[in-house]
Structures are given as structure tokens and as C-alpha cells.
Amino acid sequence: MAGRVFEAWKGSNKFLFGGRLIFGPDAWSIPFTFLLIITPVCFFSVFVATHLRRELLPNNAGHVFLVAGVLFTVFVLILLFLTSARDPGIVPRNSHPPEEELCYDTTVSSDGRQTPTVQIPRTKEVMVYGVSVRVKYCDTCMLYRPPRCSHCSICNNCVERFDHHCPWRNYRYFFMFVSSATILCIYIFSMSALYIKVLMDNHQGTVWRAMRESPWAVMLMIYCFISLWFVGGLTGFHLYLISTNQTTYENFRYRSDNRINVYNRGCSNNFFETFCSKVKPSRNDFRAFIKEEPPRNITLATTWERPEEADEENREERRQKVEDDLDIDEDVMKLQQRLNDEEGSDTAHHKIDIDQMRIGSNERAPTIRSEARHGNWGARSNAQEEDVIAGSSVRESRSYAAAEEGR
């Protein structure tokens, strides 16, 4: 029985629940991220929100702070799970290079012979919004990458609209996650500061005295302040990228190459495209069974010959074979003329000539002029050579017998 696609996947992804969930090779960091989110919220619920509920008991506002913190934390964790377990837009790789893109290139070898080879252009031009954009060929996936697609060296896949590799792999949900995490940090920081303010008002003390009474609130404020620099800065940077319709990779590349961003269609349209456009279905069915490909008629090789060049080489070979046959016929005629001239000579001398001819014929047979130039004749050339040697031997035998009778 054929296996499923995720079982033979060539990328570095990790699959769970029979290919229903797909993670990156660094999926181990997801539980660690969960702990970084859940741990401060637990301390906030036990040491801040509970006491804040008691201090604000007459107004029943403390329950709202506790429930809001827990629900918002659950929302952030759901976003983290959605962004880390979904297909980020992996482009299916090909099993062989695209044949329609093959082109011939002539290379000159060390002996001076030109050999046509098959090559695939490294880049090609495509039109995007009326502007020509160059796309590259991926040797690993054996395809031309679509516009805004790059090959991720960590997960070993070509990913559409590749931004950067991190545990949160889908861009829309990734932005919602970091922005929600930013709001959660601000919320916990604000509630911890509010709790210290309530302690100051109720006990008529100073800030330092209130901080000593609730050290957990101070620790949460420090933790959220440090985290806010990371997730808050990341949220602000990606707000800029969304407003200009760029990815992190494109931002650095355009800045270094001074290239024009052809995808920028205005701030409002860019935000609409990011958050309101329909999410395309995945190109991969990881749970599907592997289908065996039919045998291909064309076999790709490192060296190819053009059809017209192959025909020209065959014609040259046939022409050379005809020339070899003509050379053999010429040698046969000369040998017959020599035998006819020697038949009218003296008997004694004729006998000596016949003996020499035997030796000469044995030496000449394998050293015909055409053999020196071409090591292999055809079946016709070999047959004619055997006829010449056999005919010369018969004539020599008859001449020798006639000479013996005359003596």
C-alpha cells in the first residue's frame, strides 16, 4: 500500500496527527513560548487580580479584570497554535525539471569539439501589475519560484510570500499574535500598576511601601516592560511593512538594491489585502496517498544533441563508408591488373613472383588503405575484403599449377 505524502516529505517539517498539523523543524520552541505567556498570567491571576478584586469589591470591578486577563490569554494562545500548525504557503516541489524551459547551450571541450548541452535558465521574466519582475529557478524544488517566493533554508521549502522563518509561520495570524501579545503585556503592566496605586490609596503609604507589600506586581511590571520592547517593536515594524505591502526579506533587499516596490497599492488597499482578502487553500494535501508517476518518454541527460546535428553526423558517416568501399574496389582492380601482367612472364620468374605475391597478399590484406583511416567498416566492407583475399588466392593457385605443367 502506498504511503502518504507527509511520510515521504522532503522538507524539514514535523507532522502530527497523521499529517493534519504541520510544524517547522524548530517546533520544540512552541511549548517554550506557551510557558513564556502562561507563567506571567498565572502570577497575575493569583497575586494581582485576586487581591485587586478584593480591594475593589464594592464595585465588583475586580472580577472583570480577572476574567478579561484569562480570556485574552486564551485568545493569544489560540493564535499561536493557528500560526504554528498551518501550512504557511509551501509550493509543491517538482519531481523533475520543467521540460518546456529546457534550452541548448554549446560548450567546447578540450579537444575542440562542440557539444550541445541541456540547461535551464537561472532566471526568467514575468509580469506583475504591468511591470517585469525577474524570478529565479530553485535547484532544490526544481521549479521557478513565483513572485515574492523564496526558499527557506531552515524548513527546506519554497514558501509563497516568504517573510522570515520563526515558530509563527503564517503572516496574517503571526501579526495578530504579536499584536495581541503586545496588548496583553500592556494590560498586565497596567493592572499591576493599578494594584500598587490602590495599595497606596488604601493604606496612605508611599510608592515604595506599596511595592514592598506586592513584590509580584513589581516583577510582573518589569517582565512586561522588557517583553514589550520585543513584541511591541515587532508589531510596529510589521505595521510599516503592511502599510507598504512588503515582507521583511523584500524590505532589506529593496533597500540594498534601491529597487522599486511594485506591490505597493496604497496604505488602505495594502491593509485590506493583508487582513480581508480570502486565504488561498493549501497547495499540498499532506494526507493524500502518493501516486506513482508514469514512465517518462524523454530522459533528461547531461549532454544532448540536436536532431539536425545527429542527421548531419549520420550522413557524414554514410559518406565516409561509401568512400571506403570505393577505395577497396580500386585496390581490387590494381590487384587484378598486376596478376594479368604477371601471367605472361617467364615461368621461373612467375613462380618466384607468385611466392612473393603470396607473402604480399598476406601482408596487404590487413593493411588496406581504408583500414588505416577507419577502424570499423560495415558488413559490406568486410565482405568485400574477404572476397578480394579469396579471389587472389585462387588466381595464385591456378597460375602456380599452370607453371608446373609447362615445366
From Swiss-Prot:
It holds the Pfam family DHHC. Residues 136-179 form the DHHC domain. It is a multi-pass membrane protein. Its EC number is 2.3.1.225. Residues 346-356 have a biased composition (Basic and acidic residues). Residues 300-407 are annotated as: Disordered. Signal peptide: none annotated. It is found in: Cell membrane. It catalyses: L-cysteinyl-[protein] + hexadecanoyl-CoA = S-hexadecanoyl-L-cysteinyl-[protein] + CoA. Its main location: membrane. The active site is at C166. GO terms for molecular function: protein-cysteine S-palmitoyltransferase activity. One of its GO terms (cellular component) is plasma membrane. Coiled coil: none annotated. Mainly expressed in seeds. Keywords: Acyltransferase, Cell membrane, Lipoprotein, Membrane, Palmitate, Transferase, Transmembrane, Transmembrane helix. PANTHER family: PALMITOYLTRANSFERASE APP (PTHR22883:SF43), ZINC FINGER DHHC DOMAIN CONTAINING PROTEIN (PTHR22883). Belongs to the DHHC palmitoyltransferase family. The DHHC domain is required for palmitoyltransferase activity. This is Probable protein S-acyltransferase 9. It comes from Arabidopsis thaliana (Mouse-ear cress).
